[in-house]
Amino acid sequence: MTEVLFKYHGNLTGRAHFPTLATEADTTSDKYSNLYMYVGLFLSLLAILLILLFTMLLRLKHVISPITESTESVPQFTDVEMQSRIPTP
């Protein structure tokens, strides 16, 4: 019984499948549509990675040398220098 089902219903190798007009018509835009998609995907991922890299580098730069307001009239002191200048009663 199952052999009869496979012979007539399950096996599609005996049937001829002719290509439709959509698969036969191969224009230039169809040839390169996948290429354009992959190039666009690659460029967008590259742009995202570059943006992340630059933001991480800027954060690291601010951690290493924090931004201070550049006022030349006000001297900058470290904590050790400030503790030695505090008057003691």
Curated annotation (Swiss-Prot):
Spans traversing the lipid bilayer: 38-58
Subcellular location: Membrane
Domain of life: Eukaryota
Keywords: Glycoprotein, Membrane, Transmembrane, Transmembrane helix
Membrane topology, as annotated: Single-pass membrane protein
Gene Ontology cellular component terms for the protein in this record: membrane
Entry annotated with the keyword Glycosyltransferase: no
Residues that carry a glycan: 11
InterPro entries attached to this UniProt entry: SERTM
Chief localization: membrane
Protein name: Serine-rich and transmembrane domain-containing 2
Gene name in the database record: SERTM2
